Amino acid sequence: SIPAPAQLYCELICRSDKLIAATDAVYPDRAELAKDVSKVYRELILDLYKHGARDIKLDDCTWGVLVNDSFWHAFDEGHLKREEILQLYKEINENALVDLPEDLRITTHICRGNYDSTWASEGGYGPAAPYVFKEKGVEAFYLEFDDDRSGDFAPLAEVPADKVVVLGLVTSKKPELEDPEALKARIKEAGQYHPLATTALSTQCGFASTEEGNHLTDEE
């Protein structure tokens, strides 16, 4: 699991005024920055493959923020509309995945924050669905759906039938277990929008994505 190319690009142009200034000093042309991020990531992925990696997951927080109406503009470059940013991030990711080995599996996880049993972003996948779910080179999408802040399943209709949707219905933020029948019902509901034959179940995220971890004991 590695940060997605679009995630790195976003960090370089959004994280802080100091970092933005340092980035602009080297890359006054953002298009060149995007191009080089994709190029370096492709080289990294091929090197990981050379050393034995056959399944690489791109951890991407950008989409979760861009669907959050309360602060998506924090990722704005000052002159682009949300749709233009979504298209840009899609292209950055796709350009890193060109002409990869056929036996290398690329997946992506849309992370919405997972630390101290809390989260960072909310909002349905709808605004990003026509972009992220159409990314070329990605075989599976790990999606958080453990509570209402992720919206409904309707955006899954944008995922091609041959791509795998991994439903993150099991929370990793608290110890209480989900009701099996409730999980079955939600999976059936998701099946209205994406074939169950290419649908899987998982936790919504990891159990300790940062050093703070979540409010869980080892036993839990």
State where each predicted segment sits:
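Domain-level signal for soluble alpha/beta catalytic cores
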Residues: 1-220
